[in-house]
Amino acid sequence: MKQLFLVFILFGAFIANAQDKINQLDDKGNRHGLWRGTHKESNRIRYEGTFNHGKETGVFKYFDDTKSATIIATRDFSKGDGSCYANFYDQKGNKVSEGKLVNKLPEGAWKYYHFESKQLMSQEFYKSGKLEGTRKVFYKDGTIAEETNYKSGIKEGNSKTYSEKGQLIDSHIYKNGQYDGIASYYDGLGNKIYEGNYVNGKRVGSWKFFEKNKVIKEVKAAKFGQELIKYEQRNAEEVTKT
């Protein structure tokens, strides 16, 4: 009985000693060694990672607020330059997104995945936390759905969207986040249906309507909306007849 009691005492001392080595500070008040954070209300584990005199090192793990403590994110600080490579997961373990963080801001290439799938949904590029370069969106089969250029987080330059069969749906030009320049629209089968110009996000000049890639009508921008309704009604009637 005394031996059993002694075992419990020693085990308790071991646990207490191990806990004393968690969430420690160095002599300058910086976090050092293994740290574990908890969710406020449940007190369940929220994250776990190792600090070296205030700097994150190795891989940090982040957990959801459930009894199973599912890993929903990891951050790898192995490079030692303050940046980290982050992975985010859903509660079933499927990867949601991944990319580099610098000063907690996205940097370089970031990838996002379709729901519960390994198939890429979009790819973006960042500079100091702002979109920079071409952002691409994909259908679940990998076909390109959209590609738009960004500069300092704002749409700038060419933008195109495509059907699931890879056919062009529309093409625009952006300037400071607004349509500015020629815009073309297609029926999803490769046939152009109308086209015109934008300036500062507003339709200007003459807009052309097409059938079988030939101009059938040209109207002023102010009357484009009315003509578009007529055009779509006429096409709907023709589809009904067939």
Explain the meaning of each model-derived region:
Residues A16-T242:
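Glycine/tyrosine- and acidic-biased, solvent-exposed loop/turn segments at the edges of beta-strands
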